[in-house]
Design a protein with these regions (language model features):
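Charged alpha-helical initiation segments
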Residues: 1-39, 141-148
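A structural signal for well-ordered alpha-helices, especially hydrophobic packing surfaces
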Residues: 21, 28, 50, 124-131
Length: 153
């Protein structure tokens, strides 16, 4: 992630978001209910980590919670979070995710799981896009030349 995150632990947390999404996709395509149940946990963790990284970058304290809806409520009012709130309406609560993680209460359907994956991508995309970034180019040079068809003989 290219976000400007000076705290090493927060940067490490943010850098693991893609790994959670990758693992969820692999689990969604793996056979067996165990993998399917764990995929929801990874999707939840991807959302939670990107939200917490954003809040940390903004200097906003947050409670140690797995509740994504509470984290959205903690997000600054300088942005419109209605899209996140809407898509999270299609995502299971943290209690439900925990039950699935521990193989309790059955397994979500494949249709539900892919919908959860879409929700996680949307949430991660919105939060990541709102993070500030800083790019540093050391020892960088550019040489601009006229194209050959514009050079005079």
């Amino acid at each position: 992630m290219t976000a400007d995150l000076p705290v090493v632990a927060v940067r490490a947390m943010a850098n693991s978001v893609l790994r959670h999404l990758d693992k969820a996709a692999a689990d969604l395509s793996a056979p067996g209910p165990e993998a399917l149940s764990l995929s929801v946990w990874d999707l939840h963790m991807a959302c939670e980590k990107v939200m917490k990284a954003y809040l940390n970058q903004q200097g906003i304290p947050y409670e140690q919670t797995h509740n994504l809806r509470d984290l959205v409520a903690t997000s600054p009012k300088t942005h419109d979070w209605s899209a996140v709130k809407t898509v999270l309406g299609h995502f299971p609560s943290e209690q439900r995710v925990m039950k699935w993680r521990y193989q309790e209460g059955g397994v979500p359907s494949l249709n539900d799981l892919w919908r959860f994956y879409d929700v996680a991508l949307e949430v991660c995309s919105i939060y990541a896009a709102r993070m500030s970034r800083r790019f540093l180019l050391d020892n960088f040079s550019v040489q601009i030349r006229r194209p050959p068809w514009l050079e005079s003989d």
